[in-house]
Curated annotation (Swiss-Prot):
Keyword check for Cell membrane: yes
Sequence ranges assigned to domain HAMP in this UniProt record: 216-269, 297-349
Gene that specifies this protein: mcpA
Modified residues (Glutamate methyl ester (Gln)): 378, 574
Matches recorded under SMART domains: HAMP, MA
Protein name: Chemoreceptor McpA
Protein's organism: Caulobacter vibrioides (strain ATCC 19089 / CIP 103742 / CB 15)
Main location: membrane
Entries under PANTHER family matching the protein: METHYL-ACCEPTING CHEMOTAXIS PROTEIN 3 (PTHR43531:SF11), PROTEIN ICFG (PTHR43531)
GO biological-process terms attached to the record: chemotaxis; signal transduction
Amino acid sequence: MKRIRLVDLPLIIKIGFAPAFALLMLAVMAGGAILVQKSQSAALKQVVERDMRQNLEIQRISKRISNINGELFVVMTHKAGNIDVDKNDARMAAVLVETDAVKKDLLALKSKLPAEEQPKIAELIKSLEECRSAIDTVSGMISVDFNMAAGFIAPFEEQYVKMTGQLDQVVAAANQRIESESAKRQAQATAAMSVTIIMSLLTLGAVGALAFLTVMTTRKSINDIAAATDKLSKGDNSIDLEKMTRGDELGGIVTALKVFRDNQVHLEQLRADQEKSAALTADERRSKEAAAAAAAQEASLVVSNLAEGLEKLASGDLTFRVTADFPGDYRKLKDDFNAAMGSLQETMKVIAASTDGLSTGADEIAHASDDLSRRTEQQAASLEETAAALDELTATVRRTAAGARQASDVVSTTRGEATHSGQVVHQAVSAMGEIEKSSGQISQIIGVIDEIAFQTNLLALNAGVEAARAGEAGRGFAVVAQEVRALAQRSAEAAKEIKALISSSTQQVSQGVSLVGQTGEALQRIVTKVGEIDALVTEIAASAAEQATGLNEVNTAVNQMDQVTQQNAAMVEQSTAATHSLKGETAELVRLMARFQVGSGSSSYARPAVADAGHHAPARNPVAEQQARLNTFARPGRSSGSAALAQAPASDGWEEF
């Protein structure tokens, strides 16, 4: 099997391979970067729009359950202290409505959570239903028997503590899911950045090496052919053209040079034969001299025309054609030379057109790199805005934690006030006891007064009897005794009334002491419950602080993603700079190709060398265009098909990429 050499490949393949490879790798890297950015954006959107919202919804539900618990104890406290009793029924109805609303929200939240977290929400809903049943029982009994209704608070409190623990587990699972997703996306972004940097460096190295190798080998081949042509034009036929044999378009020039060299050797042989003819007879010599002169004249004509053509070829003018009428066997040499010049001219046209496509491709690569850089910067700006939104969300959670701490402080203050109220009630009980004791003493004193009035009445009666015995002399004393008796009777009646009032007051004071004692016991239970509420609110505040810490970690992860995107943007800028460097190398190749004159249309091929890099032509596929031109050159008889091929790349634009 014949080995394929680089010099045997067509120039269109050697020149178009480097930009085609660069376009392919750029498309792969850009596609990978876009996929990674879309994946990162989708993950971040999921965290912000789903996980964060679910986490906040769980926190709101936890706060609402705490409010239900607090509102229930407020109703019990008001009932115990006989404060706004007429509003208790409305408050209990509102508590039941809020409990049903929380259950509805939990059912809606359950359908949005992952399957592994739904059982926890189901347990929470079951606990809430049991709490709702307990609240309904308390609502029905609070107006009938307060003490029995207070006894039903204990099951509700147990379910409330259970629900608080379940909510903490759900929040912890949500935070763990958010942190895991953030770590996964950060690792993915780091790996994508590393792969992109490595591929960019490898692509730049490969494209640079291919472009340098193609330019240098083509330049060396052209210089070697030009040097060989110059030597042949000076009569040096010793040059070895076999080493320069190749299968590309330049091989046609080498073949023409071989024909020219063989003809030169043949002419030298003719000169040698002419020298040998000097020894022949005069007639033969004259005839041979005439023949030799004619042959020499023909050879001179051929040599002069071919020398002129080779001189034009050495100067880069490929439009020259031998127009002189060569005699005899030299006509094939003329036709071969003109065919070689025509083939070389068409080949250089294709090379120039390929150079045009290479320049256009470099412009498109630079344009695509600029677009990719701009999109990466836009993605970085979007991540920066997302980081700002997460900062605001973190601040909101921190304010929620601060509100929970304030609620804890308020509950602590309420607990102190309730304790103080219990002390006041205890003092009132003691004062009522003292009043009851004083009432007993007053009753004893009134009894003594009653006995004194009775004795006074007896003494007044005896005094009246003695005054009556005394006759007229004791009449005044009898009047005085009568008045004293009347006063004693009124004192006895007043003492009886006061004693009855004191007895009634003592009974009422005893009842008041009993009621105040019951109130003290109720307040003591309320103080205990308020203490439990204080502990629960403190736990809620701690949970809110932990959530704020978790959001802060998520915010840190988003900021790291923002930094990675900024690094990607810097890498894209480096790739853009390398692309512009490749564009400069292409311009240098265009400048070298400008040395050759290839006839009509040649000026259009040199246009990319001076084109403004800031103005981009309509997007097209340069490799497909040059392939169409090569097909036109190879099959001139199919102009209509070539035109169709030339128009086809217009639909192959990759500008939208």
